[in-house]
């Protein structure tokens, strides 16, 4: 391809896997297929835009026609890293190989960890389950104020959060507790991606979070393609939870989002900006609201809604743009339990520059091929890991 692209847009449909990975059994996953099982469950998905790009050319999905002339280059990617969580998937997409998986705790944290927190702080722990912060604050806030017990909770991600009223646990004490939790969860058996202090104020029935949230994250252990872009003077616009996933490393602008549809609004607004570099969008609702909650109908509706917004995206793309749509892991809502599933992820690569449409790319053996392609496009330092497919885009 003679000219490089001025802008590359990476869209991660969080948890939208496309079929069981060869090593799924090692992760306790059998016959998992996020996209396929959702489509079967609802009697077929109505996603004409993804269909035109070539989604069903990767493998047939009920309700989505195989494109005779797909607009995009298409294949699927296999995760090489030893994990199936959000951080592992995204870090690998940007050129890292993760040997030790981050841990998630869908049933709450083990007694040993809770005991360490209680012994260190002299405070009891209440909660200890996956929950939305506002819900658990409403549920346990009054008990916390009366007893001084710490509200500890998690989410679908590798995270330990501690909520406390600022009049009950002073901020400095809360931060010290979180620093202690960070120190004891850096390695196995806990290996948590993030500890978050969640202070709040107010009276029972009217508790509100304060802006004094503090995150104790893990930074990527090596520079990623995002760092290479930033160091090379390129823009890296992170939309959604991308900046959190990378602890702000390699990000030149961060835009928070409230939902998938807000994420698409923000992304479409970014397409109107004049920039030279990468936009990187994560759409988390698929995973957080529907995958973990095992809600295939809700998941299907969200996929259809996403497809509807692609019309606006396609209208704004020029020959200087490259759009890459993928995922970071699976989360089959028809499967048992509440955890992610080890799957291939789709890869669709489109530009209006492809006058003859796209064709099949070879199967990618690591998500890092995507990051290598971005680095190759912008002539910045290539990651140690991953093989560019830029030359295959004609």
UniProtKB/Swiss-Prot annotation:
Residues annotated for Mn(2+) 2 binding in this entry: 287, 292, 340
Cofactor comment: Binds 2 manganese ions.
Known EC number: 5.4.2.7
Biological or metabolic pathway of the protein: Carbohydrate degradation; 2-deoxy-D-ribose 1-phosphate degradation; D-glyceraldehyde 3-phosphate and acetaldehyde from 2-deoxy-alpha-D-ribose 1-phosphate: step 1/2
One GO location term (cellular component): cytosol
Disulfide cysteine pairs (residue numbers): none
SUPFAM superfamilies: Alkaline phosphatase-like, DeoB insert domain-like
Main localization (coarse): cytoplasm
Catalytic reaction annotation: 2-deoxy-alpha-D-ribose 1-phosphate = 2-deoxy-D-ribose 5-phosphate; alpha-D-ribose 1-phosphate = D-ribose 5-phosphate
Cofactor(s) named in the record: Mn(2+)
This protein's UniProt keywords: Cytoplasm, Isomerase, Manganese, Metal-binding
NCBIfam families noted in UniProt: deoB, PRK05362.1
Family from the record: Belongs to the phosphopentomutase family.
Protein name per Swiss-Prot or TrEMBL: Phosphopentomutase
The organism of origin for this protein: Listeria welshimeri serovar 6b (strain ATCC 35897 / DSM 20650 / CCUG 15529 / CIP 8149 / NCTC 11857 / SLCC 5334 / V8)
Gene giving rise to this polypeptide: deoB
């Amino acid at each position: 391809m003679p000219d490089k692209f001025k802008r590359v847009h990476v869209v991660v449909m969080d948890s939208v896997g496309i079929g069981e990975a060869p090593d799924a059994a090692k992760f306790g996953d059998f016959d998992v297929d996020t996209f396929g099982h959702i489509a079967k469950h609802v009697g077929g998905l109505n996603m004409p835009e993804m269909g035109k790009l070539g989604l069903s050319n990767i493998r047939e999905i009920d309700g989505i026609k195989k494109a005779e002339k797909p607009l995009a280059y298409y294949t699927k990617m296999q995760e090489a890293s030893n994990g199936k969580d959000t951080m592992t998937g995204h870090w690998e997409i940007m050129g890292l190989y993760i040997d030790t998986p981050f841990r998630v705790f869908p049933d709450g944290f083990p007694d040993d960890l809770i005991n360490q927190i209680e012994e260190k702080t002299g405070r009891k722990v209440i909660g200890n389950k996956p929950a939305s912060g506002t819900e658990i604050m409403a549920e346990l806030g009054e008990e916390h104020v009366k007893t001084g017990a710490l509200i500890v909770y998690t989410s679908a991600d590798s995270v330990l959060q501690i909520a406390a009223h600022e009049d009950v646990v002073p901020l400095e004490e809360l931060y010290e507790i979180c620093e202690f939790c960070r120190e004891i969860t850096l390695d196995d058996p806990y290996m948590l991606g993030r500890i978050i202090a969640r202070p709040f104020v107010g009276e029972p029935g009217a508790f509100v979070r304060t802006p004094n949230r503090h995150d104790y994250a893990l930074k990527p252990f090596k520079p990623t393609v995002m760092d290479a872009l930033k160091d090379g003077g390129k823009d890296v616009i992170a939309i959604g939870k991308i900046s959190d996933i990378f602890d702000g490393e390699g990000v030149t602008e961060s835009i928070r989002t409230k939902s998938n549809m807000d994420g698409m609004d923000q992304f479409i607004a970014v397409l109107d900006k004049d920039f030279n570099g990468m936009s990187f969008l994560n759409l988390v609702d698929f995973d957080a609201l529907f995958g973990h909650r095992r809600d295939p109908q809700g998941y299907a509706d969200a996929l259809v809604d996403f497809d509807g917004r692609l019309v606006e995206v396609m209208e704004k793309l020029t020959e200087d743009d490259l759009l890459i749509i993928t995922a970071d892991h699976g989360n089959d809502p028809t499967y048992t339990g509440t955890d992610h599933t080890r799957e291939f992820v789709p890869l669709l690569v489109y530009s209006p520059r492809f006058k003859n449409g796209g064709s099949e790319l070879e199967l990618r053996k690591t998500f890092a091929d995507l990051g290598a392609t971005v680095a190759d496009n912008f002539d910045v330092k290539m990651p140690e890991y991953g093989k560019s497919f830029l030359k295959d885009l004609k």
